[in-house]
A protein has these predicted regions:
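Secretory/organelle targeting and membrane-embedding segments
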Residues: 1-118, 123-412
Length: 412
């Protein structure tokens, strides 16, 4: 395994909320390699205990070092890498706007063989910028790794395992038995301090174009024979995906969230530019032009400030049976069979867990030098192609902006 993690942006929100807790969980579970080191780096200075305070109590002090860096200066980054042995995993916990400068600086360092440069979504803002990011990674001298943390969720990994290990499920996993597949990413919270990013992205770019298309790929793909074939099968789905229509978009108006808090109209939220016409709700229908799924409809729906938190994959079978696979709240697998009386028999299986958060699984994949939980370069590009017709229609103003009250079920 890679013995050193260089964490750029170590003082930021991503590191504090997700990466350090994930590293702590891996250390407590004895899943990190012997002699493992975390080199934190950011622009500001920290005192001797500064990184330890950020990292929390689950990581020992002798595992942590800190270097102030200038991302545009290769010699500054070289000082952070100096003294490490073997390959390094460089995690860019940074705003996407500085990815290019940082990768170019890293390319000048001549990192050890088998080193990796890790970037978070969004992978560009359209097809061309995604391709440009891929080109930078390809010429960096290190292996590029694209993180979509949803792939690290146990529930998502279980989806593929269920198909592989339960032949009865795989037998009805096609358009001959399934009428419709719904992929839902419904959140009860509003902006929660993310207006600076979200107002420039919107629901479609924030989650539907990445998290939800990855789920679509895992649902629609032919089962890979091994991990090496996984990205090929996912890419085949994205190549076969076609939007049906130009979708729906909406934004919330003043209302009461599920937790009781009152929120104003989205356009009046702090940090929001009302002239951007940013959607907080996105709905897109797709079809897969593949042998197994021709004729079935896929509906993807994402929204903020809704009545219920639901992140699910739902298969609606032609015989009235419904299979609900929880992704992140609820996380159970639920099978519903409609009865003649109008009632339904419901069978519920709780999700097994190894106790590790999604980012812990992602970090293990990074450090092991594998790519099972990554987004492939062509996948990142093709995902933008899938949603391009919808984005073009929305930017042209041909799709109306609907409204829904915060805390409601969404637009009618």
């Amino acid at each position: 395994m890679i013995p050193t993690l260089l964490l750029l942006g170590a003082t930021g929100d991503l590191a504090r909320r997700y990466l350090f807790p994930a590293l702590g969980a891996l250390h407590l579970a004895d899943r990190l390699p012997d002699g493992f080191r975390v080199v934190g780096a950011a622009r500001g200075e920290l005192d001797g205990n500064g990184l330890r305070r950020l990292a929390g109590d689950d990581l020992p002090a002798d595992m942590l070092t800190y270097h102030p860096v200038d991302l545009a200066d290769p010699s500054s980054l070289a000082a952070a890498v100096d003294g490490t042995h073997g390959p390094v995993a460089v995690y860019l916990a940074l705003p996407p706007g500085v990815f290019a400068t940082t990768i170019q600086s890293l390319a000048a360092l001549d990192l050890a063989p088998e080193s990796r440069i890790v970037v978070e979504k969004p992978f560009g803002d359209d097809f061309e910028s995604a391709r440009a990011l891929n080109a930078l990674l390809a010429h960096s001298g290190a292996d590029g790794y694209r993180v979509d943390h949803v792939l690290g969720l146990e529930t998502v990994q279980r989806l593929v395992a269920m198909r592989r290990n339960m032949p009865v499920v795989e037998r009805f996993w096609n358009a001959g038995k399934v009428d419709r597949v719904e992929i839902l990413w419904e959140e009860t919270l509003g902006l929660e301090g993310r207006a600076g990013y979200f107002d420039r992205a919107g629901a479609l770019k924030d989650v539907l174009q990445n998290h939800m298309l990855q789920l679509l790929a895992l649902v629609g793909m032919e089962l890979p024979r091994d991990s090496a074939e996984l990205h090929e099968r996912k890419l085949a789905v994205l190549r076969a995906a076609r939007v049906a229509g130009t979708g729906r978009r909406a934004r919330y108006t003043a209302g009461r969230l599920a937790d009781g808090r009152e929120v104003p109209d989205y356009a009046d939220e702090d940090g929001v530019d009302p002239l951007r016409c940013t959607e907080t709700y996105a709905e897109v229908a797709l079809e897969l032009q593949t042998t197994g799924w021709t004729g079935a409809r896929f509906l993807m729906r994402a929204g903020k400030a809704l009545a219920r938190k639901r992140k699910l994959v739902v298969l609606l079978l032609q015989n009235g049976v419904e299979l609900e696979i929880g992704i992140d709240g609820p996380e159970d697998i639920v099978l519903r069979v409609a009865a003649a009386t109008g009632d339904a028999l419901e069978l519920r299986a709780p999700a097994p867990s190894d106790g590790l958060p999604a980012y812990a699984h992602v970090l293990l994949d990074v450090l092991a030098g594998t790519n099972e939980l990554s987004v492939g370069a062509e996948e990142a590009e093709r995902a933008w192609c899938v949603v391009a017709p919808v984005l073009a229609a929305w930017e042209a103003g041909t799709v109306p902006m609907e409204e829904y009250a915060a805390g409601s079920a969404g637009p009618s």
